[in-house]
Amino acid sequence: MLRNRITSRRSISSSVSALANYGKPQNPAIDTTVKMRIQPIKREGETMEIKRARLIYQSRKRGILESDLLLSRFAKKYLNEFTEAELDEYDRLLDEPDWDIYYWATKNYDVTPLPDKWKDSKILKMLQEDAKNDDREILRMPELDLEQK
């Protein structure tokens, strides 16, 4: 009889505990995400021609098709007209994560808020205008103009 009473208390105790924790994860997940930002390479002594070529390459080879399309078309359209200061600003923009650039270009700020440092950016405003695609062109990667200087 005493043995049954002890067993009953144990089963009731474990049942109450199980009910209290019902639906809760038994082993809560531990966030093991490591967040780190790699600083961009500082390039010194780079000529305007080499910088333009590098920026064209970096605009075309982002790793995300959406960003590749937006940035490669933008680079084809404007890069040859940019001043050195505008090239530097575009270079800094390309140092940002791909999805951030895409969401900023498409003004999707609820997904990725626009940082203060980019709020007055002439280059980002130009990219946003280009991303609107008012002419409703089918977006394709522009051909490389290897003769371009």
UniProtKB/Swiss-Prot annotation:
Biological-process GO terms, alphabetical: mitochondrial electron transport, succinate to ubiquinone; mitochondrial respiratory chain complex II assembly; protein-FAD linkage; tricarboxylic acid cycle
> Which species expresses this protein natively?
Scheffersomyces stipitis (strain ATCC 58785 / CBS 6054 / NBRC 10063 / NRRL Y-11545) (Yeast)
Q: Does the keyword Chaperone apply?
A: yes
Protein purpose: Plays an essential role in the assembly of succinate dehydrogenase (SDH), an enzyme complex (also referred to as respiratory complex II) that is a component of both the tricarboxylic acid (TCA) cycle and the mitochondrial electron transport chain, and which couples the oxidation of succinate to fumarate with the reduction of ubiquinone (coenzyme Q) to ubiquinol. Required for flavinylation (covalent attachment of FAD) of the flavoprotein subunit of the SDH catalytic dimer.
Q: Which HAMAP family match?
A: SDHAF2
One annotated Gene Ontology cellular component of this protein: mitochondrial matrix
**Record's miscellaneous remark:** This protein may be expected to contain an N-terminal transit peptide but none has been predicted.
Q: Where in the cell is it found?
A: Mitochondrion matrix
The answer to whether the entry has keyword Cytoplasm is: no
Alphabetized, the UniProt keywords read: Chaperone, Mitochondrion
Q: Mainly resides where? A: mitochondrion
Q: What is this protein called?
A: Succinate dehydrogenase assembly factor 2, mitochondrial
The family database entries (Pfam families) matched by this protein are listed as: Sdh5
**Subunit notes for this chain?**
Interacts with the flavoprotein subunit within the SDH catalytic dimer.
Q: Family, per the entry?
A: Belongs to the SDHAF2 family.
